[in-house]
Curated annotation (Swiss-Prot):
Its job: Catalyzes the formation of S-adenosylmethionine from methionine and ATP. The reaction comprises two steps that are both catalyzed by the same enzyme: formation of S-adenosylmethionine (AdoMet) and triphosphate, and subsequent hydrolysis of the triphosphate.
The organism of origin for this protein: Pisum sativum
SUPFAM superfamilies in alphabetical order: S-adenosylmethionine synthetase (SSF55973)
Obligatory cofactor(s): Mn(2+); Mg(2+); Co(2+); K(+)
Domain of life: Eukaryota
Protein name, entry field: S-adenosylmethionine synthase 2
This protein's record includes keyword Calcium: no
Length: 374
């Protein structure tokens, strides 16, 4: 009897996608604040449209931060250097509307900086999920890994000059054929590869397809997953000259599935970018990813989902949940007990154990581009 299989798809976006541009600006602001003041409380949002970028939100910090410079530097480093590519970093309008963190939140979460780390409460209510699978060395889903790496490859060959016709904006999508091995996911082959990338006016559609196959797809997707039936959609809409904020509006926090597991596992709905570690949308998601990855890496399960939940101002989590999808070597309740013994889910202690108060050198900015806790 033939093995029953199914298709699953994950997508990613390039650093020049308008939403991802906003994520990176918000995290560049966070980096700058934490670099000078590790106790900074940051909730920074960004939006963008043609010839305009706005940063807004609540920030309480001792850092001296030039928000406009951060915006322009980030846009320039991505490659937005003229209106022709979607945004001119040096001449676009930059709007800043930053206020202090609410005093009500400040006293409830960290007692206006008087609480010990173990007593710091969650910055808000919410539930976060961590996921891990043994199908790749990164303990990430293959569909998500390949989509993410294709996007990174597009950026690399654009910036190193291999494909000079490329521009910053773009999206990738990978469909993988899997079979379910008693709860574990086993990838068989890549069914479809989709790339839509911004380009200049000089390149032809045939040249785009040839370059993408040779310089982007071939180095990223292992040959064993490609066959004569693999489908390639390379700029299927035709031309894609107008991209970046000129093509679409962008907003922080609209690519949360791309930032996590590509549609696998689950998601609590909270975004990461522009948030300091007291915001459990970020730190809580990071620690449950570490827990799930540890479970799989240590052979307790082949696939695992971990959930944690919080109440605003309360240090201890309300709940911790483990689901091994039936792949556990021991019962899930025993895995849960091990997780609770091994991991401290209090927000202040997460910041210490994962070193989340250290900014600078593009640390959180890099998180905006690729999931760096792989």
């Amino acid at each position: 009897m033939a093995t029953e299989t199914f298709l699953f798809t994950s997508e990613s976006v390039n650093e020049g996608h308008p939403d991802k541009l906003c994520d990176q600006i918000s995290d560049a602001v966070l980096d700058a604040c934490l670099e000078q003041d590790p106790e900074s409380k940051v909730a920074c949002e960004t939006c963008t449209k043609t010839n305009m970028v706005m940063v807004f939100g609540e920030i309480t910090t001792k850092a001296n931060v030039d928000y406009e410079k951060i915006v322009r530097d980030t846009c320039r480093n991505i490659g937005f250097v003229s209106d022709d590519v979607g945004l001119d970093a040096d001449n676009c309008k930059v709007l800043v509307n930053i206020e202090q963190q609410s005093p009500d939140i400040a006293q409830g979460v960290h007692g206006h900086l008087t609480k010990r780390p173990e007593d710091i409460g969650a910055g808000d209510q919410g539930h976060m999920f961590g996921y891990a699978t043994d199908e790749t060395p990164e303990f990430m889903p293959l569909s998500h890994v390949l989509a993410t790496k294709l996007g990174a490859s597009l950026t690399e060959v654009r910036k190193n000059g291999t494909c000079p016709w490329l521009r910053p904006d773009g999206k990738t999508q990978v469909t993988v054929e899997y079979y379910n091995d008693k709860g574990a996911m086993v990838p068989i082959r890549v069914h479809t590869v989709l790339i839509s990338t911004q380009h200049d006016e000089t390149v032809t559609n045939d040249e785009i397809a040839a370059d993408l196959k040779e310089h982007v797809i071939k180095p990223v997707i292992p040959e064993k997953y490609l066959d004569e039936k693999t489908i390639f959609h390379l700029n299927p809409s035709g031309r894609f000259r107008h991209g970046g904020p000129h093509g679409d509006a962008g907003l922080t926090g609209r690519k949360i599935i791309i930032d996590t597991y590509g549609g696998w596992g689950a998601h609590g709905g909270g975004a990461f970018s522009g948030k300091d570690p007291t915001k459990v949308d970020r730190s809580g998601a990071y620690i449950v990813r570490e827990a799930a990855k540890s479970i799989v890496a240590n052979g307790l399960a082949r696939r695992c989902l971990v959930q944690v939940s919080y109440a605003i101002g309360v240090p201890e989590p309300l709940s911790v949940f483990v689901d091994s999808y039936g792949t556990g070597k021991i019962p899930d309740r025993e895995i849960l007990n091990i997780v609770k013994e091994a991991f401290d889910f209090r927000p202040g202690m997460i910041s210490i154990s994962l070193d989340l108060l250290r900014g600078g050198n593009g640390r959180f900015f890099e998180d905006s581009c690729i999931w760096t806790f792989w």
